[in-house]
Amino acid sequence: MQKGGAVMRYFDYSFLNNGLLPANLVNLTANIAELKTMAGVRKEEYIQIFTELEAVAKVQSIKSSNAIEGIVTSDERIAEIVNQNSAPLNHNEAEIAGYRDALNEIHLGYEHIDFREADILRLHEILMQFTGNGIGGQYKTDDNVILEIDAEGRRKVRFHPTSALETPEAMEQLTLAYMDARSDANINQLLLIPCVILDFLCIHPFRDGNGRMSRLLSLLLLYKNGFDAGKYVSFEEQINNYKVYYYESLRKSSIDWEKNENSY
């Protein structure tokens, strides 16, 4: 597809159903599905332990997902914001409190939230509600770039996301492509979800909060497909602990994305 002479990004996940997936990925998803079944039994046997794990993971998730973006405060304040709904005292805490509420929204109501534009915009509005910048729940109005900093501290452009003008159409096409793919019984959801989230990050639809939204949406889609380990072991903390590898994987997976030639 072309527009104004430029190649337009399209979204098609049918390659996940072509039978050519690496054996290690197929085996990994099978192992995860088996562990999910075992965890379901254990949750019924050890209710108190899982309740305590959920409380700890919630604090770790909110702390880590924000820390990845350089948004930090003291551990004491994190605990107060998460466990006592303490009002934010500064901009960083406003960002953290917004993530708390967005994560709570997913934990408590994921069955009623979907990967559709209205719900994505609503989650972003919740995420940004305390910042006072007026951009919550709205797609970007100016083009943005993804920067990286080299060992000498020099900034350079790593990636040019979708333009602001093309973002609404790209998000519509992304959500429709996901809905189409999830209805295909031959497409493994554990492989579909990271592909969709990568595309979301490459669109970079918001002026701020794209990274944190990607992690919230990852949890949402995993929960909706019955994979709720992120409630008990912080998914965001794992990314923060290995963020060098995480960002390198994003870089490799997005090479030639704008040409529809990335390999995921």
PLM feature spans:
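FIC/Doc superfamily catalytic core
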Residues: M1-Y264
